[in-house]
């Protein structure tokens, strides 16, 4: 008992040990904190880590977000955008940089979150601590457990209404806007049982996007359409655009003034075209000299003037509308000549792509052309495309034909 009491006293004394600036030691530590911050801002990650081992005060001092922000902005998937906006202010920057090294080195733990018996073409979205995923003609909502690498098995909600498979869906204004193989668009309120569907196209609706109360859809019937989200005007088409090609992907500009379509590149020479959202008129087309069949399967805006695209021609292309609409700024080629089904970005340096064979997920550092890491998620007998990718600063989620996979970079 006496020994135990002595140990407790030692622990309490250690806990009470002052984290204040040491009175003795080099004169450097007696400088004003502002000057110390300036000096330490020139240190790299390794030097800051070693300095933190000197004493408790320096460990606290070198954990300051200000010292790690510059390092984080140059790191992969640390929660900072290209313009320096911090998307995760509640998480210490030092902790994010630590996890970022696992992304850079490809250190992760693979797991399977969901399985299904029949082959699917799932799509998914993340929102806060919830995951929404399509299975056949349903959309299911699951809640993540605190570790982010597992799900509560019982769905939070099930959203139905389509007669055929859900091809695509987005989350907008507490609504789920879904595109179905039955040619219909579905509107589901997330926190109620309200569901409306209406006939939108003559054939399956392959893609949909919704921003600012406006819905855009693209279909196999070679049209793109613009719709209002307002409850009193659901199903009233604002514009019908003849694209001369099957529309595989679609995205609204953050400025809400235009939208881009990614088409099959069979009936029209350009698979990427930008349309005026208010008039439905063609504004411009991107690129030139695309080979027939170079369809764009995924397209996304990173900013009002920059966007990324990928598809059948095995390239990811980065476009900047301020420089040129005929030539992309940067491109990355899938090294095994596989179709690229989907892409995701951290808004800064990290790019993730999903390939058509063996469930291969690739990570790219956009500052270099070569692939950084590749993760084959299926073996030869069960080869599957990666239909959809989503990522956070700690995890990457990949939806395949039979499974939903997670790559955990926080606890590799």
Swiss-Prot record:
Domain of life: Eukaryota
InterPro entries: F-box-like_dom_sf, F-box_dom, SCF_F-box/WD-repeat, WD40/YVTN_repeat-like_dom_sf, WD40_repeat_dom_sf, WD40_rpt
Ribonucleoprotein keyword on record: no
UniProt keyword list: Developmental protein, Repeat, Ubl conjugation pathway, WD repeat, Wnt signaling pathway
Expression sites (tissue/organ): Expressed in brain, kidney, lung and liver.
One BP term from GO: Wnt signaling pathway
Renumbered ranges of WD repeats: 154-190, 193-229, 236-277, 283-321, 327-366, 373-409
Gene Ontology CC terms, in alphabetical order: cytosol; SCF ubiquitin ligase complex; ubiquitin ligase complex
Alphabetical list of Pfam families matching this protein: F-box-like, WD40
PROSITE patterns tied to this protein: FBOX, WD_REPEATS_2, WD_REPEATS_REGION
Keyword Repeat attached: yes
Boundaries of every F-box domain copy: 25-71
Subunit structure: Part of a SCF (SKP1-cullin-F-box) protein ligase complex. Interacts with POUF51.
Disease involvement: Split-hand/foot malformation 3: A limb malformation involving the central rays of the autopod and presenting with syndactyly, median clefts of the hands and feet, and aplasia and/or hypoplasia of the phalanges, metacarpals, and metatarsals. Some patients have been found to have intellectual disability, ectodermal and craniofacial findings, and orofacial clefting.
Function: Probably recognizes and binds to some phosphorylated proteins and promotes their ubiquitination and degradation. Likely to be involved in key signaling pathways crucial for normal limb development. May participate in Wnt signaling.
Protein name: F-box/WD repeat-containing protein 4
Biological source species: Homo sapiens (Human)
Gene (name only): FBXW4
